[in-house]
Regions:
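Single-stranded nucleic acid-binding surfaces, predominantly the OB-fold ssDNA-binding core
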Residues: 1-109
């Protein structure tokens, strides 16, 4: 059996795409909201929203910069990346990101 790190998400962006430029290229960062609906024990309908941090580089970063705006519905495929960094106070912080490998632009806002 082959082991994989693959995720597919369909949702709406929560903010404008942020572009971070480097000497050898750029990355695009944006948050994506996905929602699930269920009925709780009291018979009430509940909506639960999860926020995901998307990161793309190369041609995908260019596409996101040009075509993705706040509220845009998109579908992405990618992999889950866990990383850590030290903040300004020297405290180790952990972050989970989705490294985008494919993107499909869906309906408008």
């Amino acid at each position: 059996m082959s082991l994989r790190n693959k995720v597919t998400l369909i949702g709406r962006t929560g903010k404008e795409v942020e572009i971070v430029k480097f000497e050898n290229g750029q990355i695009a960062k944006v948050s994506l909201a996905t929602s699930d609906h269920y009925t709780n024990a009291l018979g009430e309908k509940v909506e639960e929203t999860q926020w995901h941090n998307l990161v793309a580089n190369g041609k995908l970063a260019e596409i996101m910069e040009k075509y993705v705006e706040k509220g845009k519905e998109i579908a992405v495929e990618g992999k889950v990346i866990y990383r850590s960094y030290d903040d300004k106070e020297g405290v180790k912080r952990y972050i989970t990101e989705i490294r985008v490998e494919e993107i499909v632009l869906l309906g408008g806002k």
